[in-house]
């Protein structure tokens, strides 16, 4: 190769390098930094974005900021004004161990002398039959009739052998059911509900 050809190749290489250099710079300048949080260009100038622990420069009117504490509900303001202080506890998290004893339900303890343990009427299906008449009138006469048999069967049991006269007269006057049962048992022999002259005068 002669000298002119070498110079021509060198000039061509320099021109290629010169044309490629501005393109690389333009591509570097066109790249934008990645913005965090906002995609809108107008919202990229958010003041205080990403600042966590810096105090606010403006002092709000009715808010008194507290110092950050170790509790999870840090940064909750306390209000001085009664009108603003309606939402004083709004947003506060309940403490994990503070109200644990209040939430627990106390189980009942066994008290032997308690009235609740007595189940009155439990298991009773039917009530006792009510007796319309005078209690013991029919059984009274049956006892008189079967008194000899009872003496044979139960020697130790005291049998009814006599009735006081005053008690009998008083019961006949004041207790019509008792008087009716006496008449039916001793006078009305045929049990027809009618008293004949023979039944009334049979002992005379």
UniProtKB/Swiss-Prot annotation:
Induction: In the 5th instar larva isoform 1 is induced in the nerve cord by starvation, ingestion of the ecdysteroid agonist RH-5992 or parasitization with C.congregata. GO terms for molecular function: neuropeptide hormone activity. The modification Phenylalanine amide is found at residue 49. Keywords: Amidation, Cleavage on pair of basic residues, Hormone, Ion transport, Neuropeptide, Secreted, Signal, Transport. Residues 50-65 have a biased composition (Basic and acidic residues). Expressed extensively in the brain, frontal ganglion and terminal ganglion of the day 2 fifth instar larva (at protein level). Not expressed in the larval brain after day 4 of the fifth instar, or in the brain of the pupa or adult. Expression in the terminal ganglion is localized to cells in the posterior portion of the seventh neuromere of day 2 fifth instar larvae. In the pupa and adult expression is detected in the medial region of neuromere 6, the dorsal medial region of neuromere 7, and the posterior neuromere of the terminal ganglion (at protein level). Neuropeptide stimulator of juvenile hormone synthesis. Cardioregulatory neurohormone that increases heart beat rate in the adult but not in the larva. Inhibits active ion transport in the midgut of feeding fourth instar and day 2 fifth instar larva, but not in the midgut of pharate or wandering fifth instar larva. This is Allatotropin. It comes from Manduca sexta (Tobacco hawkmoth). The lineage of its organism: Eukaryota, Metazoa, Ecdysozoa, Arthropoda, Hexapoda.
